[in-house]
């Protein structure tokens, strides 16, 4: 599989990294938290791109996309996705989100339904109320040093 395009788009004050693979009906891949394109979808990409135009993004503070000074919220990330789709000329797409990406896909469908044809959601929460308090506490105190050496960081 070859990458058709590897680029950055300026959306909502963010310099968002994305890749486009293949041709056909657009499919947007939205990765999980503390992950990126390769760690969430690397093994799936070649098969998905055989019959689809796969648009894989790296959201705020993940992979090649730097963090900016704004809350990391589903609503903000959903607005980034629709801004990217507009910028690259995609009117409507199927969204496949995993974990954090599933929440972003869900918010995209709720807030910007005109962009969404179909949703595939894996391991999704609607909001943080569905998460264990211990998990939220761990996330709140996590640092880059805590993640050093983990598979998520080695593969970025």
Label each region the model flagged.
Residues 9-67:
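Conserved HGGG/HGGXW glycine-rich cap/lid loop of the alpha/beta-hydrolase fold
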Residues 55-57, 98, 122:
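The conserved SAM/SAH-binding core of class I Rossmann-like methyltransferase domains
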Residues 58, 94, 117-120:
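Residue in the alpha/beta-hydrolase core beta-strand immediately N-terminal to the catalytic nucleophile
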Residues 75-93:
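Conserved acidic catalytic loop of the alpha/beta-hydrolase fold
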Residues 93, 97-99:
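Conserved alpha/beta-hydrolase "nucleophile elbow" surrounding the catalytic nucleophile
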Residues 103-106, 110-111, 116-149:
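Flexible "cap/lid" loop of the alpha/beta hydrolase fold
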Residues 151-156:
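Helix-loop "lid/cap" segments that line or gate small-molecule binding pockets
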């Amino acid at each position: 599989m070859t990458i058709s395009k590897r680029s950055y788009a300026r959306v909502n004050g963010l310099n968002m990294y994305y890749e486009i693979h293949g041709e056909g009906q657009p499919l947007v891949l939205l990765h999980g938290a503390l992950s990126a394109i390769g760690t969430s979808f690397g093994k799936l990409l070649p098969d998905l791109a055989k019959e689809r135009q796969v648009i894989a993004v790296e959201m705020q503070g993940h992979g090649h996309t730097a963090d900016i000074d704004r809350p990391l919220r589903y609503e903000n990330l959903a607005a980034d996705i629709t801004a990217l789709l507009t910028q690259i000329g995609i009117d409507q797409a199927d969204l496949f989100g995993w974990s954090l990406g599933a929440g972003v896909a869900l918010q995209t469908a709720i807030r910007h339904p005109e962009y969404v044809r179909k949703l595939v959601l894996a391991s999704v929460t609607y909001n943080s109320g569905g998460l264990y308090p211990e998990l939220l506490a761990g996330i709140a105190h996590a640092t880059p040093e805590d993640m050093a050496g983990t598979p998520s960081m080695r593969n970025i």
